[in-house]
Amino acid sequence: MIPAKDMAKVMIVMLAICFLTKSDGKSVKKRSVSEIQLMHNLGKHLNSMERVEWLRKKLQDVHNFIALGAPLAPRDAGSQRPRKKEDNILVESHEKSLGEADKADVDVLTKAKSQ
């Protein structure tokens, strides 16, 4: 058996080690900043990939809907407020000539219809 004097020395050394390490009941292993940043970047990447996949599926549904030639459902006229011509003006009339804007609008519409 160990003498009491030696046991007291061992206990003092053990208490000193416990108080000087300052673990406070927390795990001693901590993650480095780069590891935390890597995990954060991975989370953002996975989130963005989920969003891209969701958007791809939605666009595929729209493409399939249009490709099948399904008629578009008419909008309920009661739910939309009537538009006034003044609400549609996006650019001041003196900034563009009427002919240039109309040609561009017609070109865009014909390209959209041909697709």
From Swiss-Prot:
Its main location: secreted. It comes from the Eukaryota. Residues 51-69 are annotated as: Important for receptor binding. GO terms for biological process: cell-cell signaling; intracellular calcium ion homeostasis; positive regulation of D-glucose import; positive regulation of glycogen biosynthetic process. GO terms for cellular component: extracellular space. Residues 72-96 are annotated as: Disordered. The keyword Signal applies. Residues 26-31 form a propeptide. GO terms for molecular function: hormone activity; parathyroid hormone receptor binding; peptide hormone receptor binding. It is found in: Secreted. Keywords: Cleavage on pair of basic residues, Hormone, Secreted, Signal. Pfam families: Parathyroid (PF01279). Interacts with PTH1R (via N-terminal extracellular domain). Belongs to the parathyroid hormone family. This is Parathyroid hormone.
